[in-house]
Regions:
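Double-stranded beta-helix
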Residues: 78-127
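Glycine- and acidic-residue-biased ligand/ion/polar-headgroup-sensing regions
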Residues: 25-26, 35-54
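Conserved short histidine dyad/triad with adjacent acidic residue
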Residues: 16-34, 61, 70-72
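Active-site scaffold segments
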Residues: 41, 68-69, 85-89
Length: 127
C-alpha cells in the first residue's frame, strides 16, 4: 500500500513484543483487519480514525491520545485531514499466536500476522 509506511522501533524476542511506528496518509484507510492479541497505541501526530466494517466512523484519536486495546471486532483505520503517525505496541507474548488477521471484503482471513512474521519483516527492513 502506497499510503502506509512503518518503522520498527523494537522487537523483543524474550517478551514477544513488537513496537513500531505506522504512518497512514491523510484521508486514506488501511486494509480491514482484526486484532487477535493485546496492543496499545499512542497517536504522535494527526488524528487516527477507526471505522466499522460498514465504513461508519468508530473513533477519532488525536495526537497525544493513548489507548490500550484487546482482541476485538474487524475494523479499518487511517489518517484524518493530515497524515497520522501512530506508535503501536503489539503484545502477543508468544511466537506463533496471531497478532492480527488481514481480512477481505467478505471478512475472510487472507493473511495472519504473528510475532515470527513481524520478526521476518523487521529483518527485511533492516537489511
Amino acid at each position: 500500500m502506497d499510503h502506509v509506511s512503518l518503522s520498527f522501533l523494537n522487537v523483543d524476542e524474550n517478551a514477544k513484543i513488537v513496537d513500531l511506528l505506522f504512518k497512514f496518509s491523510a484521508n486514506e484507510k488501511i486494509q480491514m483487519h482484526r486484532h487477535c492479541s493485546n496492543y496499545s497505541t499512542f497517536t504522535v501526530q494527526g488524528e487516527l480514525k477507526t471505522y466499522y466494517p460498514d465504513g461508519s466512523l468508530k473513533s477519532v484519536r488525536p495526537a497525544g491520545v493513548f489507548k490500550a486495546g484487546t482482541p476485538g471486532e474487524p475494523h479499518t483505520e487511517g489518517g484524518g485531514d493530515e497524515d497520522v503517525i501512530v506508535y503501536f505496541s503489539l503484545r502477543p507474548y508468544t511466537t506463533t499466536d496471531p497478532i492480527y488477521e488481514l481480512l477481505d471484503e467478505n471478512m475472510e482471513v487472507v493473511q495472519m500476522m504473528n510475532f515470527e512474521a513481524l520478526q521476518e519483516l523487521n529483518e527485511e527492513y533492516s537489511a
